[in-house]
Amino acid sequence: MEEYILEIFNSKEELCAKYKIDNIKILKLDDEGAKTRLALIKTKNSNLKFIFMYYDMELKPQLINFFKRNFIILGIQSKIIRINLENNVIDTLVDFSIIPFFEFLENDSYLIAIFEMGISVISKDGELKWKLELPEILIDWEIVDENIKLSYFDGKIGIHSLQIGELLS
């Protein structure tokens, strides 16, 4: 499988000028208007694959390549999106509505998506294992063995099992 990369643009005009294209199909994750940006997914050889319009929360989207599978995972806005590269089917695995996506973490078994007040765990097969909306804003997180340690704005710390999401302490 080819490696896919993510490129961000401030406007449709900027994207069209760089890639010299006139008519593009944009998948809208948010209404045009407010503070939107474009996220372009392409191969390393510059073959354009997908273009998403999203509300810019000042947090950069993140793309994960699953080289042994035929899909990629995109963390963008408040969503985790799985894109099947064989048939171009786009599935929303997680949508926390207004809770912004921060970043992905990985271990040998799972892909962990960290949100401002949420967490989701995805298997290496691209299936959602579990998701959890959290009671407080996260300020720090780390994988510890097969668990995830979450530190909250109010000073509390929680440790969850990555396998089932259960709060261990």
Can you say where each PLM-predicted feature lies in the sequence?
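Repeated scaffold domains used in trafficking and secretory/extracellular systems
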Residues: 2-30, 51-69, 95-109, 134-147
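Acidic, small-residue rich beta-repeat scaffolds with periodic aromatic anchors
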Residues: 5, 140-169
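Short loop/turn segments that connect beta-strands within the blades of beta-propeller domains
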Residues: 34, 68, 76-78, 86, ...
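Aromatic (tryptophan-biased) beta-strands that constitute blades/sheets of beta-rich domains
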Residues: 40-57, 89-100, 127-134, 168-169
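A glycine-rich, hydrophobic loop/mini-helix early in the fold
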Residues: 44-90
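WD40 beta-propeller blade core
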Residues: 81, 120-121, 158
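Short loop/turn segments that connect beta-strands within beta-propeller blades
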Residues: 85-88, 123-127, 162-164
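Acidic, glycine-rich flexible loop segments
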Residues: 114-137
